[in-house]
Every structure is written in C-alpha cells, then in structure tokens.
UniProtKB/Swiss-Prot annotation:
The keyword Secreted does not apply. Mg(2+) binds at residues 105, 227. Keywords: Acyltransferase, Cell shape, Cell wall biogenesis/degradation, Cytoplasm, Magnesium, Metal-binding, Multifunctional enzyme, Nucleotidyltransferase, Peptidoglycan synthesis, Repeat, Transferase. Pathway: Nucleotide-sugar biosynthesis; UDP-N-acetyl-alpha-D-glucosamine biosynthesis; N-acetyl-alpha-D-glucosamine 1-phosphate from alpha-D-glucosamine 6-phosphate (route II): step 2/2; Nucleotide-sugar biosynthesis; UDP-N-acetyl-alpha-D-glucosamine biosynthesis; UDP-N-acetyl-alpha-D-glucosamine from N-acetyl-alpha-D-glucosamine 1-phosphate: step 1/1; Bacterial outer membrane biogenesis; LPS lipid A biosynthesis. Residues 1-229 are annotated as: Pyrophosphorylase. One of its GO terms (cellular component) is membrane. CDD domains: GT2_GlmU_N_bac, LbH_GlmU_C. NCBIfam families: glmU, PRK09451.1. Its main location: cytoplasm. This is Bifunctional protein GlmU. In the N-terminal section; belongs to the N-acetylglucosamine-1-phosphate uridyltransferase family. One of its GO terms (molecular function) is glucosamine-1-phosphate N-acetyltransferase activity. It comes from Citrobacter koseri (strain ATCC BAA-895 / CDC 4225-83 / SGSC4696). Binds 1 Mg(2+) ion per subunit.
Length: 456
C-alpha cells in the first residue's frame, strides 16, 4: 500500500578499496555523472520528501560534490554493515512515512522499478527487490516457505542446501518508518562477518506475521553494483547501449551505436545524423536535419536546423542558428554565437564572440570577446587581441567588412561597416565605415643578395 510520504536512505559510506583511487567510490562517474548522483536523481524523481545520505570515507569530497543537492548527511563513522548504516539514519525516520533503502554504487536503478516496488509494499510489511541468477555465488539467498518470503541468508552463513537457491537479494527494500525503526533496534551481529545485516529484518518481519512482497527489476543491470573499475566500465557500456537504442528508435541516425556516448540529455529534431565517436555532454538540443561528424564533442549547446558540424570539432556552451557550418577541427568555447548561415572552418577558435548572418571565418583564427556583423569575411590567421595581461576588451566589426589574412585587431577597437582591412595589418585604432586600412613594413628588394655562408 502506498503511503503519501516517503524518504530515501542512500548508503554511500564504503571506501571502495578495489577502485584503487583517492576518490570515494560513489563519486566515480557513469555517463559523466557521479554514480551516487544517478541514485539521488532517481530518488527525487520518485518523489522523496527527504534523502538521507549515509557517508563515511571522503566526507568532505562528497559534501563538496553534492553541495547543490538537498541532502540530510548521516555519518557512519565505523562501517559495521548495512544494518548499522540504517541504524545511523533511523533517528530521522518519521513513523508514518515509508523508508526506501538504496545504494550509492548501484547507479542504474530505474524510477519505474522503484515505483513498482513502492506500489507492491504490503501494509505493515516489506517490499523487497530480488532477482534470479544462474550463478548466485556470493549473494544473500531468498528463503521461502510455501511460496512466501521468510528471510535472507547471506552466502557465508548459508547451508549447502540454501546455496542452491537462485533467487538473491539486491539489497533494495522499502518499509514503514515505525516498523523499520523497531526491526533495526533488534538487529545483532551474531554472524560470520560480525556485522549488522539489514537483511535480518526480513526474518523479523516474517516472525511478526508481516507480508514480504518480492518484486523483480526489468533488467539485471538495474541492480548491479560497482566494486571495481571493470564493473563500472561494463555498466557504462550497458547504459550507453540503452541510450543509443532509445535515440535510434526515436529517429536519430547513429552510424555506430557502440561508438556514441551520451553524458547528459539530448533533445533532437527529425533526420538528425551522428557519426562515430561523438560525445554529447550536458544539455544539448539539435534541430532538424543536423549532421555531426566523427569525433565531435558537443556540450550544453543549442544547434539549429540544417547545421553541419564536420569531424573533430568541439562545441561548448554555444548557440548556432540555422544552416551554420562548423569545422573540421573547430572549437566553439562558452559564449560563442553563430547567426544563420555563418561558417567557422578548420582551426578556428571562438570564445564569447558572435558571428553574424552569412559571415565566415574559414581557417586558423582566434575570435574572442568580439561582435562580428553580417556578411563579414575573416581571413586566415586573424586574431582579436582581447587581453592586455590584466583585462579583457571587446572587438566590434560591422556588417560587410573584409578582414585580410594575418590581421591583428588590438581591442578595444571598432571596425565600421564596409571597411576593408588589408592582409598583414595590425589595427590599433577605430576604423570608419568603408575605409581601407593597412599597416605594413615597406617591402624592400635587394638584387644579388648573398646568403651568409655556413661556418665549417
């Protein structure tokens, strides 16, 4: 029966010795996000009124990383088992709310499965998430009597007969707050590990005549935990495969689903094509008929209809209007804006710069802190010199300007509409509309010039 209120406890106190890392295990990332953040997000989406995070090792790192989440931090100074961890959180439980127990190193648990578990919890009983494995070695076995769940026996404490059981405990369960506190108070550490097992509450509930409802997840990967980097890498591939499948079924053409990484959220239009080894980070929006070439990285950007991004380009915190062309090997840094039909070619870098409608920067240029008008040509090797060693300054270029190759624009500077900047010019003062500007060392010719001889 579903209570209106529910709190979630996430166990995240483990050190993660087998990760061989200074980083707490639950902060290692899957799809660009800390494992524990996946679990927190699921809890919040499920409607948790409070999320209690039980921590131990690396508390400062955890708190700093998760500072934007509304968490109740619960210290487990000694790691004496899952039951002990829940005992630390128990003082915060309300009697009339449900308590859902999750794990910070089980990142792929789905909201849909958790909702089914919550719905299945009997009044006064326990909802328990279980799975059946061909090889259940090392896992706690589910014991039943006449089909009813009677308890969980940890592998080290199980008899030979019990070790033949294939149904195992995932560790995820839900119960009423008052019941949970009462059962937690009765736990002992009289077992092979000398720890307090949360699983012992199943037998306590059964002895009280309470019902235990077992629910199975849709996919085994939902309940797979991470103890080492190999397991984490496998779950990463599972997750990416699932995301790629969803995108393909929604109409996105992934040329090789096995070589696509989604590390955030992708919103897309129709007939989008994505080549191999593309990485999507953060929140990305792709319009209709967008094409992304091989090896591109797109992060927190909006890309308009009919844009074409050539291979090995990096686009971060940028906004592209329709029909823009990028790359190959272009870099759009935060604050880059391209108006309709603009072109940024190979080895061009933009940062906090706007390139106007139909304007082009074809190759080998740096455009930083700049406002560039419509139908402007930026020649190869153009640099907006925006930094004087202490402060940044802006370059403003009007419509229909032609900037020749190897030009330096020393900001702050404004170039008027229709102006022409000759190749090799260093612009240090404002340029009026329709002016021609050039600054060059006079070209000298010396007939019969002899090169210096090399010393032997």
């Amino acid at each position: 029966m579903l209570n209106s209120a529910m709190s979630v406890v996430i166990l995240a106190a483990g050190k993660g010795t087998r990760m061989y890392s200074d980083l707490p295990k639950v902060l290692h990332t899957l799809a660009g996000k800390a494992m524990v953040q996946h679990v927190i997000d699921a809890a919040n989406e499920l409607g948790a009124s409070q999320v209690h995070l039980v921590y131990g090792h690396g508390g400062d790192l955890l708190k700093n990383t998760l500072k934007n989440d509304n968490l109740n931090w619960v210290l487990q100074a000694e790691q004496l088992g899952t039951g002990h961890a829940m005992q630390q959180a128990a003082p915060f439980f309300s009697d009339d709310e449900d308590i859902l127990m999750l794990y910070g190193d089980v990142p792929l648990i789905s909201v849909e499965t958790l909702q089914r578990l919550r719905d299945a919890k009997p009044q006064g009983g326990i909802g328990l998430l279980t799975v059946k494995l061909d090889d259940p070695s090392g896992y706690g076995r589910i014991t039943r009597e006449n089909g009813k769940v009677t308890g969980i026996v940890e592998h080290k404490d199980a008899t030979d007969e019990q070790r033949q059981i294939q149904e195992i405990n995932t560790g995820i369960l839900i119960a009423n707050g008052a019941d949970m506190k009462r059962w937690l108070a009765k736990l002992t550490n009289n077992n092979a590990q000398g720890e307090y097992y949360i699983t012992d509450i199943i037998a306590l509930a059964y002895q009280e005549g309470r019902e235990i409802a077992a629910v199975h997840p849709d996919r085994l990967s939902e309940v797979e935990g991470v103890n080492n980097r190999l397991q984490l890498s496998r779950l990463e591939r599972v997750y990416q495969s699932e995301q790629a499948e969803k995108l393909l079924l929604a109409g996105v053409m992934l040329r090789d689903p096995a070589r696509f990484d989604l590390r955030g959220a992708l919103t897309h239009g129709r007939d989008v094509e994505i080549d191999t080894n593309v990485i999507i980070k953060g929140n990305v929006t792709l319009g209709h008929r967008v094409k992304i070439g091989a090896g591109c990285v797109i992060k927190n950007s909006v890309i308009g209809d009919d844009c074409d991004i050539s291979p090995y380009s990096v686009v971060e915190d940028a906004h592209l209007e329709a029909a823009c062309t990028i790359g190959p090997f272009a870099r759009l840094r935060p604050g880059a804006e391209l108006r309709e039909g603009a072109h940024v070619g190979n080895f061009v870098e933009m940062k906090k710069a706007r390139l106007g409608k139909g304007s082009k920067a074809g190759h080998l240029s740096y455009l930083g802190d700049a406002e560039i008008g419509d139908n402007v040509n930026i020649g190869a090797g153009t640099i907006t010199c925006n930094y004087d060693g202490a402060n940044k300054f802006k370059t403003i270029i009007g419509d229909d300007v032609f900037v020749g190759s190897d030009t330096q624009l020393v900001a702050p500077v404004t170039v008027g509409k229709g102006a022409t900047i000759a190749a090799g010019t260093t612009v240090t003062r404002d340029v009026a509309d329709n002016e021609l500007v050039l600054s060059r060392v006079p070209q000298v010719h010396k007939q019969g010039w002899q090169r210096p001889a090399k010393k032997k």
